[in-house]
UniProtKB/Swiss-Prot annotation:
Protein name: Small ribosomal subunit protein uS7cz/uS7cy
Subunit structure: Part of the 30S ribosomal subunit.
InterPro entries per record: Ribosomal_uS7, Ribosomal_uS7_bac/org-type, Ribosomal_uS7_CS, Ribosomal_uS7_dom, Ribosomal_uS7_dom_sf
Main location: plastid
Organism, scientific name: Populus trichocarpa
NCBIfam families per record: rpsG_bact
Amino acid sequence: MSRRGTAEEKTAKSDPIYRNRLVNMLVNRILKHGKKSLAYQILYRAMKKIQQKTETNPLSVLHQAIRGVTPDIAVKARRVGGSTHQVPIEIGSTQGKALAIRWLLGASRKRPGRNMVFKLSSELVDAAKGSGDAIRKKEETHRMAEANRAFAHFR
C-alpha cells in the first residue's frame, strides 16, 4: 500500500476566446516546438474558415466532428501464450475524445493542400458531415474490434 496520496486528475483549461476545454485540448495537440500562439492562430483561423463555409456556429461543427470521430471501442495488443492478440477494450469518454482529436489532426496533416488552416477546417467540416479520413479511421477501429471479438475474454 502506498504512503503517498493519490494524484488528482488534471482538468483541461478553457481557451480565451471560446471558453471551451475541447478547443484548448485541440490547441495543445496542434502545438509544435512550444509555439502555442501559432497553434491558437491556426485554430482560430480554421474556425473562421468553417464559419464562412458552413454559415453555422464553428464550435457546434467542432463538437459534431469530435462526436462523430470518437470511438466507443478500440483494440489493444495482448501477449497470450506466445502469440499476440488484438483484444477489444471499451474506451472512456476522455480517452475517446483524445483519440478523436489525434485522428482529426493526423488526417488534416495528411491532406494535400496549401496550409494547416485550410486542411484543418476542411477535415472538421468533413468529419461533421460524416466523411473524411478521421471517420474512416474510427470505422476501421470498430471493424478491427468486431473481428477480434473472440479475444474479448483476455482483458
